[in-house]
């Protein structure tokens, strides 16, 4: 049974400082210096009050450490909602869609993004249910250890860490290339350093400033996407400077599909990867000031982001840009000149706006770089708390920053200085990306499986869903559906890796596309050998459903939910529909 706890203000009193005269001036520097000291203990989540006086098992220690994290809850509702909306609106949408259009054609990319959107929505619903009930450090990384078994948590956690660890220098390179849109003679290294310093400052200011920065970045991205959709409708209807009615012109010629089924499979993989980062909302749960109300709203925002921002943009791109446009050929995740957003505006005869779109792409690059440091540092901190990474990497200072994890990630970002200019180093960089290339798919699969096992444990242990502050709208079957689609992604990636579009089968392309599979298997097997633990999964009756749970008075919770339902029942049907999705 869960119990409501009294708030302990002891540490609030300790942090108060004099505010008069010279004391205020010296107090600022003292506060900065003191902020790097070890964190003060935080209030515990439920399930950790009565620790048995015996040697703990690995899974018990993992659950208890995650529930006692010293990360600070400073993210507000506005931060979570914008992070949920904008966490994956980046170069994957603004640039990566160009390559998918060239490979698959307009119908293929619309279908691919629609299928991926459904998959992500189902997965995020299950993740939301877990994250609201268990707002612990590490999020889905911890859920894999808690509801599946620690070996899977180890493999998924380290692969997720590596994915975003390598992403920071990639985004810095993308930022430098974006600048060259205006002046090709500019030295890339100068802007790599500038962008790196901006990311360093934001991430070192703490989680609250990360939230504020993302609020600004995401607002700009959202405005840009909505503006592009409106502009796209105008251009399609012939309202542009060229006064040419486009309609379904490019769907008829050159046609709806390119490269038949193989092109569609390739587009499906690109679509899935473009949603990478959506799951990051779960990492914010342990630093949210109001998990009970803020996180469900943020999770529901996924629906609107998918429908409006992604599918809306994809339909505009598919209608305004022919898939055989030569500017799309050879497009990559960092080549902004191949952005279908830019091409669509240029084709429409509009001057000036391409520079605006590229400025938005530049902001997206900074946003994703900023988010990559956040994801990497929190994941590494969680792994350290679980005993799966060196203990010192989990150091949290008094400002609530996983300090060493942040510094490690930012220092590695300087690898972009090498990757920006040296072709041989770029090859090595691509192989580093390949190591974790399928990390998002594995992470989503672990979320699906964790939710399925959580629901199974609830049933076996005779626990009611009324205990949960938030219940997935898609239920447990949504997680089964998401798991099935994620398995299909792996099959499609294997197929495309073995038989690449427009090329002959070769070992280089195959391993570049599928290296993530043997890497994650090796990680899992390595953990088993290291721990000498050959348990394949935790039995449902043995899954700990209490440690790390949010502090909730169950009677009060059920009363609040009943009152909310009663009030909603009195509203018009359109309000009820809105509240269901928002």
Swiss-Prot record:
Q: Which UniProt keywords apply?
A: Amino-acid transport, Cell membrane, Glycoprotein, Membrane, Transmembrane, Transmembrane helix, Transport
Give the principal location in a single coarse category: membrane
* Superkingdom of the organism of origin: Eukaryota
For the null mutant, the annotation states: Decreases two fold the citrulline uptake. Leads to defective hyphal formation in solid hyphal-inducing media and exhibits less hyphal clumps when induced by N-acetylglucosamine.
Q: Which residues cross the membrane?
A: 82-102, 120-142, 150-170, 190-210, 216-236, 263-283, 302-322, 343-363, 402-422, 427-447, 481-501, 510-530
Compositionally skewed regions (Polar residues) per UniProt: 9-28
Q: What does the UniProt entry say about where the protein is found? A: Cell membrane
Return the annotated region ranges for Disordered. Answer: 1-28
Give the family this protein belongs to, as stated in its UniProt record. Answer: Belongs to the amino acid-polyamine-organocation (APC) superfamily. YAT (TC 2.A.3.10) family.
Outline what the protein does.
Amino-acid permease that coordinates external nitrogen source response and morphogenesis. Is capable of transporting several structurally unrelated amino acids such as leucine and phenylalanine, though with a lower capacity than the GAP2 and GAP6 permeases. Has citrulline import activity. GAP1 is also able to transport thialysine, and thus probably also lysine. Functions as a sensor via detection of some amino acids including methionine, leading to a rapid activation of trehalase, a downstream target of PKA.
Name the UniProt record assigns to this protein:
Amino-acid permease GAP1
């Amino acid at each position: 049974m869960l119990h409501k706890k009294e708030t302990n203000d002891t540490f609030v009193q300790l942090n108060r400082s004099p505010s008069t005269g010279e004391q205020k001036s010296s107090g600022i520097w003292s506060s900065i210096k003191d902020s790097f000291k070890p964190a003060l203990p935080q209030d515990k989540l439920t399930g950790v009050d009565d620790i048995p006086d015996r040697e703990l098992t690995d899974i018990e220690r993992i659950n208890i450490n995650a529930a006692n994290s010293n990360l600070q809850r400073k993210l507000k509702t506005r931060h979570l909602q914008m992070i949920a909306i904008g966490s994956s609106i980046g170069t994957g949408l603004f640039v990566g869609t160009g390559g998918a259009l060239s490979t698959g054609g307009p119908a293929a990319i619309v279908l691919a993004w629609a299928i991926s959107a459904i998959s992500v929505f189902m997965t995020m619903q299950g993740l939301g249910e877990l994250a609201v009930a268990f707002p612990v450090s590490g999020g889905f990384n911890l859920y894999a250890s808690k509801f599946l078994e620690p070996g899977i948590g180890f493999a998924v956690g380290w692969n997720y860490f590596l994915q975003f660890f390598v992403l920071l220098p990639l985004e810095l390179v993308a930022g430098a290339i974006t600048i060259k849109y205006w002046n090709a003679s500019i030295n890339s290294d100068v802007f790599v350093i500038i962008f790196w310093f901006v990311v360093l400052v934001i991430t070192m200011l703490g989680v609250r400033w990360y939230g504020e920065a993302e609020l600004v970045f995401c607002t700009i991205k959202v405005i840009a996407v909505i503006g592009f959709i409106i502009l796209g409708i105008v251009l399609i209807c012939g309202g542009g400077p060229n006064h040419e009615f486009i309609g379904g012109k490019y769907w008829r010629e050159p046609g709806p599909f390119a490269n038949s089924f193989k092109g569609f499979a390739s587009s499906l993989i690109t679509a899935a990867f473009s949603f990478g980062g959506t799951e990051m909302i779960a990492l914010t749960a342990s630093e949210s000031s109001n998990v009970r109300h803020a996180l469900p709203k943020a999770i529901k925002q996924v629906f609107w982001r998918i429908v409006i921002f992604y599918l809306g943009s994809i339909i505009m791109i598919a209608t305004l840009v022919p898939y055989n446009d030569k500017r799309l050929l050879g497009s990559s995740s960092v080549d902004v000149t191949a952005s279908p957003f830019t091409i669509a505006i240029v084709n429409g005869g509009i001057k000036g706006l391409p520079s605006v779109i590229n400025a938005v792409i530049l902001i997206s690059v900074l946003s994703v770089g900023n988010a990559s440091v956040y994801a990497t540092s929190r994941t590494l901190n969680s792994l350290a708390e679980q005993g799966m990474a060196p203990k010192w990497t989990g150091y949290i200072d008094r400002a609530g920053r996983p300090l060493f994890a942040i510094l490690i990630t930012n220092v590695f970002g300087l690898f972009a200085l090498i990757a920006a200019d040296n072709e041989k180093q770029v090859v090595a960089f691509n192989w580093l990306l390949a190591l974790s290339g399928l990390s998002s798919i594995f992470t989503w699969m672990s979320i699906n499986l964790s939710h399925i096992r959580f629901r199974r444990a609830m049933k076996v242990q005779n626990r009611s869903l009324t205990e949960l502050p938030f219940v997935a709208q898609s239920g447990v079957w949504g997680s089964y559906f998401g798991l099935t689609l994620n398995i299909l992604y792996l099959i499609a990636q294997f197929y495309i890796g073995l038989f690449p579009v427009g090329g002959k089968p070769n070992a280089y392309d195959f391993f570049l596309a599928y290296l993530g599979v043997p890497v994650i298997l090796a990680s899992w097997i390595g953990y088993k050998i290291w721990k000498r633990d050959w348990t394949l999964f935790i039995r449902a009756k043995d899954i700990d459903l209490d440690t790390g749970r949010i502090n909730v008075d169950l009677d009060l919770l059920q009363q609040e939910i009943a009152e909310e339902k009663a009030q909603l029942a009195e509203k018009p049907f359109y309000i009820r529909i809105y509240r269901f999705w928002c």
